[in-house]
From Swiss-Prot:
The record marks R16, T77, Q159 as: Important for substrate specificity. It catalyses: dTTP + H2O = dTMP + diphosphate + H(+); UTP + H2O = UMP + diphosphate + H(+). Belongs to the Maf family. YhdE subfamily. The active site is at D76 (proton acceptor). Nucleoside triphosphate pyrophosphatase that hydrolyzes dTTP and UTP. May have a dual role in cell division arrest and in preventing the incorporation of modified nucleotides into cellular nucleic acids. This is dTTP/UTP pyrophosphatase. It comes from Nitrosococcus oceani (strain ATCC 19707 / BCRC 17464 / JCM 30415 / NCIMB 11848 / C-107). It is an enzyme of class 3 (hydrolase).
Length: 196
C-alpha cells in the first residue's frame, strides 16, 4: 500500500519497528536517537511511555536539517507488572529476574506512539495484556542463553522464541513488538488528511 501515507522519519534504530513500518508501506528515513529512558520519580507507566515517545520524536525533529524536514514518529514500549515498569534488562541476571516475575501471570505492555511536525504533536497508546505460562527453570535458562530478550523491554521478544511462553494475548501483537500498526496508521492518516 505504498503511497497511502506520507514519508516520515523514524526516531528509532529498532529493526522490529522498521520492519513493521515497511509492512504497511511507509517510506521512512531512520534516525539514531538517544534519550534518557529513566523513569521519573512516581511516574505512572502511561505517562512514562508517552513522555519517551514524544522525547524521541522531538529529538528526531531537532536532528534533521531545517530544510526538507520530515514528520517524525517516535515510540516507546514498557512492560508493566503490578504498576512497575520493567525496562530493558541491564544484564542476563536482571533478565532472569524479569522472566521469573512474568512467569505464570498476566502483565501489560504499553506502547505509545508520537508523531510531530514541529511544534504540533499527536499521540496514541496501545495497551495489551499478555499472559505467560509458568516457566520451567530449563526454559528460562535456555531463553537467557539465547540472548534474545536482553535488549527488549521486559526481557522478551514476542516475535521470537518467547512466543512459546505466551498462553494468551489481548490487544495488539504489533504493539507488543514495539509499534502498534493500527494506532500508527491513525496518526499517519491524520497527517495525510492535513496535507490535502
Amino acid at each position: 500500500m505504498r503511497g497511502l501515507f506520507p514519508p516520515i522519519a523514524l526516531a528509532s534504530t529498532s529493526p522490529r519497528r522498521q520492519a513493521l513500518l515497511a509492512q504497511i508501506g511507509v517510506e521512512f528515513k531512520r534516525l539514531d536517537i538517544k534519550v534518557d529512558e529513566s523513569p521519573q520519580p512516581a511516574e505512572r507507566p502511561t505517562s512514562y511511555v508517552y513522555r519517551l515517545a514524544l522525547a524521541k520524536a522531538r529529538a528526531g525533529w531537532g536532528q534533521q536539517p531545517p530544510r526538507g524536514r520530515l514528520p517524525v514518529l517516535g515510540a516507546d514500549t514498557a512492560v508493566v507488572v503490578e504498576n512497575e515498569i520493567l525496562g530493558k534488562p541491564a544484564d542476563r541476571a536482571q533478565a532472569g529476574v524479569m522472566l521469573t516475575r512474568l512467569s505464570g501471570r498476566s502483565h501489560q505492555v504499553l506502547t505509545a506512539v508520537a508523531l510531530t511536525n514541529g511544534d504540533e504533536a499527536q499521540y496514541r497508546l496501545s495497551v495489551s495484556t499478555v499472559t505467560f505460562k509458568r516457566l520451567t527453570k530449563d526454559e528460562c535458562e535456555a531463553y537467557l542463553a539465547s540472548g534474545e530478550g536482553l535488549d527488549k523491554a521486559g526481557a522478551y521478544a514476542i516475535q521470537g522464541w518467547a512466543a512459546l511462553f505466551i498462553s494468551r494475548l489481548e490487544g495488539s501483537y504489533s504493539g507488543v513488538m514495539g509499534l502498534p500498526l493500527y494506532e500508527t496508521g491513525e496518526l499517519l492518516g491524520n497527517l495525510q488528511e492535513r496535507k490535502k
